[in-house]
Amino acid sequence: MEDINLTIFSDDALPHAVVVDDYVIAIKRNPNGTFLEPHQMYDRYTQEFLQGKARDVLRQNGRDGYKLIIPEALSTGIIRYENKTKGAQSEVELENQLRSSIRHQRVKPRMDEAHRKLQIELRGGQILLHPRIAESIEFSIISKENATCSHTPVNCAYEVLLSGGINVGTGTCYDLSSRLKLRVIGDVDRHRRSMQNVLGRVIHTGDPKIINRVNQIGSQQFIDRAIGPDKFELKREIFDRLKALDVDVRKVIREEEASAELDEMGRRWMRDQNVNIVNDIIQSLVKKGSRSEKLAHRNEQGMQARFRRTIATNLRDQRQGKEVLNIRGTRGQPEEKKFAAVLLMTGCDIVERAIWSNEETAILRGLYAYAHDKLGCVYRAMKKDFVWSIRPTYTDRCAGVCDRKRTIMVREDYFDLQREENDSVYKWIITEWDKNDVIISAKNGYLYSKYSGEDEDDILVHEIDDRLYTAMIDRILINGWIEKEGLSQIIKEEVRLESFDFTKDAYVDEAGFLVLPEYYDRVIASNIYDCKFKISRVSITSSSNDDPWDKKTADSIIDEQCLWKIPLPNIIDVRPCFRGDLLTSNSQEYSKRFSGIIDELKKDKEIYDDFIPVQEGVRPCVQGHVCRYAFYRQKLTIFTILKRYYPIERILELTDEEDYEYNLYLDKECYKKESLILNLRSIFSLICFLIDFGYEGREITRGEDEYLKIFNEINYGGHARKEAINKYFPQFYQRLMRVRTSENIEDLLPLAFYQALLLSDPCTDNSEKSSHPLILFCQDKVRVVPIRTATQERGLPLLCCIHIFKFHPGLQMRKKELEDDIKKTLPAIFDYWIELEMKRLDTGDRLRTRAQMVELYYSTNCGGSYETLNFVFPIVHPNKGFIACVISSKGGMGALNEDDVRRRFRRIQSSIQGIFSISIDEEMEIQLHHSGNIQARILEKVFFEHKWHIVQVKLNGKIFENHELITKLMN
């Protein structure tokens, strides 16, 4: 076949046999040339679009019915074929390239069985493709540029989102559970006596007591989550512990789906204990416990299997003893409540401890949530209503304690908080140190020591517990590195910020007093995080829910430049600073924080000239200005922290002096490498450049394809990892191998760069509970500390570690001999890191498939967008290659479409023998663009009074054939 013909029609009266069946591609326009708006493409036969707040783009689950496609398979297959002909085939390398891509897509196609065509929708109509052509498709969202825009891949607008470079955060919130109601049974006189101490301060002593008791329920005031402004003052008094309380389960009009399913199963079980509902129970519990922002835990299937075995026994009364029988026979309790009690008891028994709302597996989270729905304060209700107590044999020391507490709080994500002004919540308030105050001498470095300030007598100090630290070192010497918990395991118990859980620590006791933890309303100062923390009752000052940068309480939002210092997911909520909706046809204002970033860019003289100038009165570009600059600053921060670990001779070579000062947080010295750092496309590439620059003497960057190859060989190369490091970084490798037997601090330092390499993939699978050993340089000694990166949250693991890397030795202590405990543990630590198996997210994970959705959002901040579908026609003669075709919707521009195709096939440019682009515009107009050694024209065809168009592409001697191209290339 020496030419290609495509049809374009809009007449429904045309028989498909005439305009579709005999053509490889047919385009059916919408009636009257109409176009759908972006929001109208939701849930159609096209690429996956999501609705909701833009800030949740990486938190939403994917929609059912969409299938994964891998557009890069064609490029990878051709490279594989070319390498095979050269005898340089590497199956593992090519597989890794596909698995590490972040450009996969999810599509919902429709198969027209009668006409053997795959039907896909664009805004302007339907594309009907032969299945052999459809295997090469890729969708693209093309953002239209305004006057100062630059929408090029070098902006890394999606990469900065994945790396957390435009995230903001703030302390999380807590409020009364929606399933509970608090009744006021009296006032609280908190202090029996008052006296003055020697400093003249008033000290309150004695236990609180209840006064003005109200015994009749009908006369008691109450609050629940649904209160209005008339009860805000009462809620404030309750949260301030001025009221005595009783707690009831709140009835709801309609249960959510999973709870309703479990209720029905419970009623069936009460009638027949042999009913086969085990699989249905598990399915509903997992549904109830699933959280869109959480990765599925590695042990999810194992936990479900354990639960399946035990619940099957319990439901059939085959359990030893009469606990299930007694629960089922309890009088005066609803059937659903009895069922929930049996499920809860089963869950606790299989893990041998009490379970809670923050469990790592979905089945246990769902189990607790269902029990909470039915029982309210679950362990108190189990003891009071079913005479079941937490077992003394459990491992959590909860027996006799937790079942006396009525826990009433739930965590509320700050960014999802929708409360009226003057309402109250509990909130973590976080205050960072003044960045201008931290001036460091290069000779002395920045070493960790516990906080000491003028206010240290009035606050709690977050610090390492020497006894717990010594116990951990002893375990390492015996077992190697097998630590699962993070830093909290070596921190003093009363200040363990890393493991505080206010939902467990705040409760109503048996007497009716609201009990808050010892750390409540106390400042906790931490030099590890360079911040002060306090949880207090706060008032809502704004109900705004559009811009994450808008404050809802009096305290501040933490910007992207400070967030890396505080990797505490248990007390901090984090979101991309995306304002507005994800899927909309309207232009949107970007976040106020982005305006601040642009102002900071204009003041940054070292790098501003590398950007398109910001024009007065013209809105700057989110991709070209905000994302690019935010990513640059994130990379610069990592560069300036890790450069302090360079060999001493390299530092002296770069600085020409040993005694100089720098600001720990405002240091921008990167030895005139600003432009190189700006253009690096990933954090991994940055770490590679740091090693090249510091150890190999390399002054320029490598190509991004080479960085990708290094990334896959080192991070996912298994046993070949050491050989890969030696191949690409030979000087660094020699120093790294000496870490295991380090004698002094200088010998230790290369380990930090190796750790950074392994932790620099934002698509790492963080689902398995574990911690990594990092080196913490302290004033009194060098310590090894456990840091958790596996938090079941998607994100860059390195951001959980940079706050430890910021502590670094000064130049004068580089030759200081290491203490014996570190020397003895180093072999175990080094072996752990060398053998560490990094696991990547699945090819279909949302981080790998949301690039186009994010591009669509970015376009609403600029000039809008249009969409394209591109695919290829294989050429077999005279030279193998392909012709690329692009079909675009209203506003499509041929030159931009061609650029997008060349972006897709950048690694196989020589295989492109021609490109033609068809833009379907309004009022039945068709735009045609072509390049390369082909010719294209639009023909008008009339057949039995029907009229339509044909796009004819002359191949100039080339022969279109080679069906099943990708299938053959990948086999």
Swiss-Prot record:
Gene Ontology MF: a single term: structural molecule activity
Cell compartments where the protein resides: Virion
Keyword terms of this UniProt record: Capsid protein, Inner capsid protein, Virion
Highest taxon listed in the record's lineage: Viruses
Gene name as annotated: Segment-2
Family membership: Belongs to the orbivirus VP2 family.
Protein name: Outer capsid protein VP2
Species of provenance: Epizootic hemorrhagic disease virus 1
Chain's role: The VP2 protein is one of the two proteins (with VP5) which constitute the virus particle outer capsid. It is the major target of the host immunogenic response.
A cellular component annotation (GO) from this entry: viral inner capsid
